[in-house]
Amino acid sequence: MSIASNSTVIILGSTGSIGTQGLDVIARHPERFTVTGLAAGGAHIELLAQQAAQFHVSEVAVFDETKIPALQAALAQAGAQGVRVTGGPDSVIAMAGSGANVVLNGITGSIGLEPSIAALKAGSQLALANKESVVAGGHLLFSAQVRENQINPVDSEHSAIWQSLRSGTHAEVAKLVVTASGGPFRGWKRADMENITPEQALHHPTWNMGPVVTINSSTLMNKGLEVIEASRLFDVPPERIDVTVHPQSIVHSMVEFVDGATICQASPPDMRLPIALGLSAPDRMANVAAACDWTKAATWTFEPLDDEAFPAVQLARHCLAASEKHTAVLNAANEQAVHAFLEHRLPYLGIVDTVKAVLDQMDAELRGNPLFTDVEEMNQLELEARRRADDLINKQ
């Protein structure tokens, strides 16, 4: 679908990494976009108020409704006039489903699924950076579409695949190749990782992201989630999706076709490029990000993934092959384990170990009925996965 020349846009997760960069793209192209609503968790109230004032939005929503009084005061301080303020998850879902031309979902976590579904049902084009919507929600998300091609992937890897797929038909695709920077511990062996601290793991060599995504990138769980997302977004089975480590993060992913040709998307790492395409596709906007400088010598390297040191990708593959419920448990247990690690309650290697232990506990019950009937069933399963993860973490 071609986005209207002056599109109304709602930004979910506006104070996070995706949201702030999305607003930066929009600020550079005011003739193309009008921001009508912003939603955020509530941790950065002053920034949210400043964004509302800068973009003259009509509504702001916070997941944490206890932050409404502080937000109202911050809006007044920022000079934002006539802004409707709402709170709680239902208010964010309602905003997402209000019928904007485009909804950019930059929320982290499976809490982003219901807003994604609401946006699709309302007919909005969904610029999706919330990979958990696909990992945990699967067919619940896709069945909410009211037309074909309603989801524009915003993750850099999936945007790269999406762009590369234009070079052939689905039947001509041999495999997808998802690239990984390798994270801050590339080249480390498992025995070297026992004493890794949150401070070390939060130092990513390439990307500036939120804390949970940064930890996921260091364990390569993020790459495992991306394999799941790629398989479901592009209808390619997991055995035809490879992962290669590319430390320079210039090639963002590739598609290999049946004739032996490999098509890739390459650019210096800058999330504004896939965000901009997610907002404007199929059109491209000028001067969004810097291009590769072909006047300078450069070396791009690719190396195989060390599955022994980083078992998260293989674990994700097993879950993808098993069922949608397995991938939801994978995601929920991982979120709990990452939060525990960030709070110094779980050692680094305990993150993926905890996730695997939860999956082992729940495997038999998950296989009986592999698909969710509704979001409530998914939420209940995630709660159980989180509870079991917490039990294991508390025994550490």
From Swiss-Prot:
Its EC number is 1.1.1.267. The keyword Metal-binding applies. The keyword Transmembrane helix does not apply. GO terms for molecular function: 1-deoxy-D-xylulose-5-phosphate reductoisomerase activity; manganese ion binding; NADPH binding. NADPH binds at T15, G16, S17, I18, G41, N130, E132, G210. Its cofactor is Mg(2+); Mn(2+). 1-deoxy-D-xylulose 5-phosphate binds at K131, S156, E157, S181, H204, S217, N222, K223, E226. Gene3D superfamilies: 1.10.1740.10, NAD(P)-binding Rossmann-like Domain. Mn(2+) binds at D155, E157, E226. InterPro entries: DXP_reductoisomerase (IPR003821), DXP_reductoisomerase_C (IPR013644), DXP_reductoisomerase_N (IPR013512), DXPR_C (IPR026877), DXPR_C_sf (IPR036169), NAD(P)-bd_dom_sf (IPR036291). SUPFAM superfamilies: 1-deoxy-D-xylulose-5-phosphate reductoisomerase, C-terminal domain (SSF69055), Glyceraldehyde-3-phosphate dehydrogenase-like, C-terminal domain (SSF55347), NAD(P)-binding Rossmann-fold domains (SSF51735). Disulfide bonds: none annotated. It catalyses: 2-C-methyl-D-erythritol 4-phosphate + NADP(+) = 1-deoxy-D-xylulose 5-phosphate + NADPH + H(+). Keywords: Isoprene biosynthesis, Manganese, Metal-binding, NADP, Oxidoreductase. It holds the Pfam family DXPR_C. One of its GO terms (biological process) is isopentenyl diphosphate biosynthetic process, methylerythritol 4-phosphate pathway involved in terpenoid biosynthetic process. Pathway: Isoprenoid biosynthesis; isopentenyl diphosphate biosynthesis via DXP pathway; isopentenyl diphosphate from 1-deoxy-D-xylulose 5-phosphate: step 1/6. Catalyzes the NADPH-dependent rearrangement and reduction of 1-deoxy-D-xylulose-5-phosphate (DXP) to 2-C-methyl-D-erythritol 4-phosphate (MEP). Belongs to the DXR family. This is 1-deoxy-D-xylulose 5-phosphate reductoisomerase. It comes from Bifidobacterium longum subsp. infantis (strain ATCC 15697 / DSM 20088 / JCM 1222 / NCTC 11817 / S12). The lineage of its organism: Bacteria, Bacillati, Actinomycetota, Actinomycetes, Bifidobacteriales.
